[in-house]
A protein has these predicted regions:
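A short acidic, glycine/proline-enriched capping/turn motif at secondary-structure boundaries
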Residues: 100, 109-110
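Active-site beta-strand-loop-beta-strand hairpin of nuclease catalytic cores
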Residues: 94-103
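Short acidic loop-to-beta-strand element that houses the catalytic metal-binding Asp/Glu
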Residues: 88-94
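Basic, Lys/Arg-enriched alpha-helical interface segments
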Residues: 1-88, 111-164
Length: 164
């Protein structure tokens, strides 16, 4: 069983909502850090667009529907994706209303495929963020983790993933 730690990304927490990412099994880098590192060579402009969206949401708008490709997971799990304008790059995340966003990983989406399930990397990243969503839902139900009114998390921010 893997453990995940929810880590607040201070560079994006500017008043309209809180953004976290996930470190797996005590790793130094979060899934978002790895996403940036993996894509900085070929997708620098697209990463800039995604970072601009994250900054806009956390500073001004909150996490409203218009910024996301919704329903990227199971019904009701909050899993969605943020893309650049041309849809070349996809970042999976979990959205909790307009106040909390948990970033996972992602990668490039080829125009040759119709769905993430056709790409092993995107499928793997999607399944990981879905597992994080399930683990967070369980921790919230069991009162081990709380989403505060401002979107910050309190309680145990290290939780176990099932079946990973």
């Amino acid at each position: 069983m893997n453990k995940i730690e929810l880590i607040e990304l201070d560079e994006f927490n500017c008043g309209a909502g809180h953004i976290y990412s996930v470190a797996v099994d005590g790793a130094d880098q979060t899934l978002y850090d790895l996403f940036l590192e993996e894509n900085e060579g070929d997708y620098r402009a697209e990463l800039g667009e995604i970072a601009h969206k994250l900054n806009t949401m956390s500073t001004w708008t909150g996490f409203t529907d218009i910024f996301f490709k919704l329903n990227e997971g199971k019904p009701g799990d909050g899993v969605c994706a943020i893309t650049d304008l041309k849809g070349k790059l996809r970042l999976y995340c979990i959205r909790f209303g307009n106040i909390l966003l948990v970033l996972g990983g992602g990668g490039p989406k080829s125009k040759l495929i119709r769905a993430y399930e056709e790409d092993p990397k995107l499928l793997s990243e999607n399944l990981m963020i879905r597992a994080v969503s399930d683990a967070m839902a369980k921790a919230i139900r069991e009162k081990d983790l709380t989403i505060e009114e401002d979107g910050s998390l309190s309680g145990n921010e290290i939780i176990e993933l099932d079946n990973q």
